[in-house]
């Protein structure tokens, strides 16, 4: 059995390690210039909207960086402009809600089945069957609130509406009619 080499050798017999050593040498000699000689007026910031997006295993967080900068500026300015409602700067959407909706619909479909019908996997709704709309308001009392609505027709006479608010509570209601 052949031993594995830790570095890949190219056709020219340069290993990855050797190439990295060649690149690192000039990088170590680089120094950071003194930025005090530059004036702030020379630097132009782009006008595009900057949004930070990151996620962990439970939540997806979308943060509006421009709104955060505007909020910092409004705190430092006099209270004349403080009456304006700040922009929403944080929206949190939990991917666990998809699983909760799917589990609820699975229970609902199993409870509505007639005893003579066979239970197959084709009747279980997939998360793609949901229409998902996210709404948020910019008023100060609803800062960061996210509303998620899902509609799915289970049968001809039943439909489910699921509403969740990102701030405090979740409501689950079923309409049969």
Curated annotation (Swiss-Prot):
Origin: domain of life: Eukaryota
GO cellular component terms, A-Z: nuclear envelope
Region (Disordered): 71-90
Subcellular location: Nucleus
Chief localisation class: nucleus
Function (record text): Involved in meiotic chromosome segregation.
Protein name: Meiotic chromosome segregation protein C17A2.07c
Organism of this sequence: Schizosaccharomyces pombe (strain 972 / ATCC 24843)
């Amino acid at each position: 059995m052949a031993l594995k080499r830790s570095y890949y050798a190219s056709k020219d017999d340069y290993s990855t390690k050797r190439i990295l050593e060649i690149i690192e040498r000039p990088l170590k000699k680089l120094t950071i210039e003194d930025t005090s000689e530059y004036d702030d007026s020379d630097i132009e910031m782009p006008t595009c909207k900057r949004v930070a997006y990151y996620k962990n295993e439970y939540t997806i967080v979308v943060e509006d960086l421009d709104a955060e900068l505007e909020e910092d500026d409004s705190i430092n300015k006099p209270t004349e402009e403080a009456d304006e409602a700040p922009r929403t700067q944080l929206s949190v959407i939990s991917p666990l809600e998809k699983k909760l909706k799917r589990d609820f619909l699975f229970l609902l479909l199993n409870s509505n089945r007639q005893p003579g019908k066979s239970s197959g996997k084709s009747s279980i709704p997939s998360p793609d069957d949901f229409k998902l709309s996210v709404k948020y308001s910019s008023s100060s009392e609803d800062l960061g609130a996210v509303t998620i609505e899902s509609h799915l027709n289970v049968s001809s006479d039943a439909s489910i509406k699921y509403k969740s608010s990102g701030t405090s509570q979740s409501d689950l209601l079923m309409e049969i009619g």
